[in-house]
């Protein structure tokens, strides 16, 4: 009897430690350069649903000021009107920045795929497109490359970004356009949320938002084959309000109030506005999920839409996670953090990519293995 009990206990420990060893076998590092390169594939990918990270040869992005990297490096003088405070730091943008040493998805992919093209680099004066205020000829292709994001961008203006992206992409050899595998980060909605608190305009409804997303994705599907789109959810932008009580943010409130007046209105009106913003975020996330489900039910070998929740809990973030230009946009510190979270999620099943994102110090960077694939399946 005792022998049988001992055997069962021993078996339990063997299974437990074996499972633990398997779970811990995945390598996480502090710097992407510490990850070993992958051996070349023996056979080419069967479709966009069979991609290793080193199969990606083109990186692209559509979005707003966050993707443009506005204010990420912080202000350069103690006066708000310093011209450098109006710069987009595109080279450190979490999704597509290509500055040497920057912690970005683009640079992580380039570690495995050195011939990657499309990363944005450097800094330049803000490119503004906000509703009807959308001047032409702002793009700087030598720095922007395939980062089509513009500060202030709303879903109703997405065709402007898409036209720029198509124009730049089709300057490449047709081999690149038609056959190379591409990865596009699509992140939009924050400015729509910031504008909707007191404006029930038809072009800000969740239904119209969904239509804008789908029409944009349809053009991408038709015009940019062999593309995986990572469609990000929206987060509760209203959370930034609480940071403006911090000493770090004093003196810059007027800038943020201009950027998102709904979030910073005082008193009962401010409370109601922020509630409306959060409700809009929920509606928009449902719309985003509807779009993702649509493409999951219309599966294609040359086009896929992934879904990445962006449910960040800003109350867990250090105040330095916001840019000291306006205490509204993410700083390089937050760009780095989000990069690691989204990178680590790329090969995970959909059921493990969601959940509340809380701040962690020293997040490790996942090293991809030869059997890892970018997980395009949106269902658990």
Where are these regions (language model features)?
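Structural recognition of the beta-strand scaffold that forms the well-ordered cores
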Residues: 58-71, 118-119, 144-149, 182-187, ...
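Conserved catalytic region of serine esterases and O-acyltransferases that act on ester linkages
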Residues: 1-57, 61, 249, 258-380
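Extracytoplasmic, non-cytosolic globular domains
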Residues: 182-183, 187-300, 309-312, 340-345
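Short amphipathic alpha-helices and their capping/turn segments at secondary-structure boundaries
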Residues: 42-60, 162-179, 217-222
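Hydrophobic transmembrane alpha-helices of multi-pass solute transporters/permeases
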Residues: 53-73, 79, 99-101, 108, ...
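Short, solvent-exposed loop/turn and secondary-structure capping segments
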Residues: 70-75, 121, 158-159, 195-200, ...
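Cell-envelope and extracellular/periplasmic
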Residues: 66, 72, 112, 147-153, ...
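Conserved SGNH/GDSL esterase-like catalytic core that processes O-acyl groups on lipids
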Residues: 77-212, 218
């Amino acid at each position: 009897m005792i022998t049988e009990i001992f055997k069962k206990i021993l078996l339990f420990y063997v299974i437990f430690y074996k499972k633990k060893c398997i779970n811990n076998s995945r390598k996480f590092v502090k710097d992407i350069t510490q990850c070993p390169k992958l051996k070349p594939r023996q056979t080419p990918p069967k479709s966009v649903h069979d991609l290793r990270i080193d199969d990606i040869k083109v990186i692209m992005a559509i979005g707003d000021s966050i993707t443009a990297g506005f204010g990420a490096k912080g202000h350069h003088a103690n006066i708000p009107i310093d011209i450098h405070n109006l710069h987009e730091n595109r080279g450190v943008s979490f999704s597509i920045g290509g500055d040497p040493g920057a912690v970005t998805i683009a640079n992580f992919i380039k570690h495995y795929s050195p011939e990657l093209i499309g990363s944005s680099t450097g800094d330049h004066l803000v490119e503004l497109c906000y509703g009807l205020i959308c001047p032409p000829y702002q793009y700087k292709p030598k720095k922007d490359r395939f980062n089509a994001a513009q500060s202030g961008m709303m879903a109703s203006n997405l065709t402007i970004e898409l036209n720029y992206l198509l124009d730049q992409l089709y300057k490449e050899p047709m081999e690149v356009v038609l056959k190379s595998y591409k990865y596009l980060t699509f992140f939009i909605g924050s400015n729509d949320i910031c504008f909707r608190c007191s404006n029930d305009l038809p072009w800000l409804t969740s239904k119209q938002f969904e239509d804008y997303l789908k029409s944009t994705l349809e053009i991408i599907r038709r015009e940019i084959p062999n593309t995986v789109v990572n469609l990000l959810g929206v987060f509760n932008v209203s959370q930034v309000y609480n940071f403006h009580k911090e000493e770090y943010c004093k003196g810059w409130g007027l800038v943020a109030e201009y950027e998102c007046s709904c979030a910073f209105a005082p008193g009962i009106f401010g409370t109601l506005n922020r509630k409306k913003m959060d409700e809009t975020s929920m509606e928009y996330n449902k719309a985003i999920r509807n779009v993702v489900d649509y493409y999951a039910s219309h599966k294609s070998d040359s086009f896929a839409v992934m879904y990445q929740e962006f449910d960040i809990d800003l109350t867990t973030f250090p105040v330095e996670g916001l840019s000291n230009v306006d205490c509204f946009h993410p700083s390089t510190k937050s760009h780095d953090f989000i990069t690691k979270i989204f990178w680590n999620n790329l090969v995970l099943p959909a059921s493990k990519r969601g959940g509340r994102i809380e701040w962690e110090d020293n997040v490790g960077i996942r090293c991809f293995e030869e059997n890892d694939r970018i997980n395009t399946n949106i269902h658990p």
